[in-house]
């Protein structure tokens, strides 16, 4: 039986008395691609933030790779990759400079040059991040999430802004990484993407799981 990479029990988070995540429980096994789905405002991003410990949940328990997300954040940081839609980067920073900055944070980083080649942005290393197209920037953010050489990666709206061909290229790379043992926790709006990649899904509506 595979170990649990993520275990969430009765997670609850509210703002001004309104529940954004309401009594959510889920389990993600090691080596699995898990999809968290829902409309904007359903509680997907807040769920990820509570799992990572960057937001304090009101109640509930969370275990990530056997760690307590808040107490063991430094250890967890070395084993988890996170990709979000946009980052707060210096305006003129170049792709290679940003990759080098991220690389320095980790003990056993992956080869970011190889990752950039694999994701089709190997010829953009000297370009300013802000000069990249939306699709190129999206692929860069996935590369940044993989630089830690993580056991678990969180991918938020994985292929937003990519054309059909680029999306399928990303899917293939993730399938290869999954075969190597990577666990993926992703959010997506695309049902074809979910069908192609996910082993299990949870659908949120107003913070509550309506399908799991």
Where in the sequence are the language-model features?
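ABC-family P-loop ATPase nucleotide-binding domain
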Residues: 1-12
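ABC transporter nucleotide-binding domains
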Residues: 13-186, 191-205, 211
């Amino acid at each position: 039986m595979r170990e649990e990479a993520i275990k969430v029990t009765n997670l609850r988070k509210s703002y001004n008395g309104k529940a954004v995540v309401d009594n959510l429980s889920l389990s993600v096994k090691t080596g699995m691609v898990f999809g968290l789905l829902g409309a904007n405002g359903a509680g997907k991003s807040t769920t990820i933030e509570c799992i990572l410990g960057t937001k304090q949940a009101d109640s509930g328990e969370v275990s990530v790779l056997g760690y307590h997300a808040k107490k063991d954040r430094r250890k967890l940081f070395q084993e988890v990759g996170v990709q979000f839609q946009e980052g707060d980067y210096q305006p003129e920073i170049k792709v290679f400079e940003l990759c080098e900055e991220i690389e320095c944070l980790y003990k056993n980083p992956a080869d970011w040059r190889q990752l950039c080649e694999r994701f089709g942005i190997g010829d953009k290393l000297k370009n300013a991040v802000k000069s990249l197209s939306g699709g190129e920037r999206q692929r860069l953010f996935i590369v940044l999430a993989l630089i830690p050489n993580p056991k678990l990666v969180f991918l938020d709206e994985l292929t937003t802004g990519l054309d059909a061909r680029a999306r399928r290229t990303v899917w293939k790379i993730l399938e290869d990484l999954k075969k190597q043992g990577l666990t993926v926790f992703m959010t997506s709006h695309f049902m074809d993407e979910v069908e192609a990649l996910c082993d299990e899904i949870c659908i949120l509506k107003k913070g509550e799981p309506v399908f799991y």
